[in-house]
């Protein structure tokens, strides 16, 4: 047994150079585990076109070998974990690729396990499951890099930039340099410090201060990369990205730490930012980077700005500036551009941290512009983003208890800028209604109505390469995997997800219904079944209670921006026709006129008209209205106000920073359409609208909506009985054994039947 010591992330990697067994009685036939890929990104795809983990076997002999019925395993305790199909052969000097994706349903050469990125064992056993033929213990792997035998160096294991399935491995790196040590962790600072960086094993540190990655695998060093020679003075807001480098070794993973100095943030300056290389225009319209001195220097707010910046979590994005702002390829300067696959997605580092004991994480992922009308730069300078977690960036999921909910693994997240009812909007009426919590409130409400998958989220301050970008919402996105996780089904089961009605197609692609996951087939089936008004089948393919709750919410909140092709989402279907569920999405035009009896589109889904013609559906609808709007239900006045106050408290101080960043945009930077143009501030505008909703909207809205539903024939004029337990109002819940239930008739006449 030979030991090869590779310092990979501080761990010892043991490679077993076994006295390999001769196969099939031939003295010349030997089978090796030749190469593995544990993180994808190498351009090798399976029959479904997906980049999966894989294991390559190599027959070093001259004669063919039958490897059928041999075993592959990633667990020493279970040597017979996956059996190679009978009759599988490797010809002399040939190779066999086996997909280690954990999904045997994808094909005969798909093993029932996947390879761990942090390292594990891979073993090949003979047909008896006892005799070990070959084995490799590997350490932490890198995206797009394989681990294989270098046959020009005696078959030692090395890291290789070029995957060579079906061919002999050549060259490679001796090991991976360990991660860079930072003397100070990301976070908030008031006083400057000397940042020390270090790496063991004889390597040296390369770093950047402009957000770009100092090193790209296969791409070399960044043009702005510097060699660390001594402590770095950090006395202003700064993003430091560093990598360990050593000749002949694969560089370490890039480490990223953002250091925020609140007193520096409030002095964020337009001229200095442009002088640093940022563009003065975004898509032909004036760029704005400044924190407005009229807010930061105002005695009312100056003393509260530091606390405002620390009051909610911070999300820091770091990337090459060109990825965001290049005139041709930047996603922010080309917000209307959409392409296939990853064409308009850019690699970034994301850090999430808090001044308190809140979330703390860093992950590399993809960033893209998100939205419809909000992408138009003349309508809003502040764009929403989507975060995508993929193996090509390092991790296929964000594994973190982000929202204190049941879902702790994410393939995507939403960074919502808030387009409608925001201080940057082109319409003066909407600017005066800015609250930055309406969409949160809608999603919270759907959850409280009994829909735990209703998209959890919280507010964050966003920074891009150290530049404060404003107040954003970070929340779940209703993807296929989101549906699977919340409904307890296998994450690999095909599920469909849609953004608006995909059968609704108009000339504007950004506001046309789209399939975001899967196919349109199950959605077409749902619409067909509903059109036939087959109540029995409808209940199988539609989560009726969820659809009713979603509909009631949109009517109650007066969602005047509900459209056929956008501003709502749904998921379900798939080959097994899972029940479709609906989600509040882009609920920004709500809680405006308390007396309104209109929404954007009465039947945005194309389902409601047929459903409400079914007596059983109307009865269920009335039951859900009563559940939510009476007896301290989720839509009772007290519960509505409680949710609103909770979200208001969350951003109460944070909106001061948003005001300084964007409150002057329409007055001072880009006047569009009509005025009046104000400097929008917390006390004058945000507080006034907040109090209007509390004092004028919620107190009367229930009566307005109940009359509306009654006029639509969806709620009876007769009041429901009032339940009491031992003389106290109680509708549901636990009671003591032997308690006395009484039912009172609130109507002037009639009887109660039960």
Residue ranges and their predicted role:
Residues 29-32, 88-92, 98, 141-339, ...:
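Short, compositionally stereotyped local motifs that mark structural "simplifiers"
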Residues 574-710:
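C-terminal catalytic region of ATP-dependent kinase domains
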Residues 2-14:
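Bacterial N-terminal signal peptides that target proteins for export
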Residues 317, 387, 540-596, 698:
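Active-site acidic catalytic loop and adjacent metal/ATP-binding pocket
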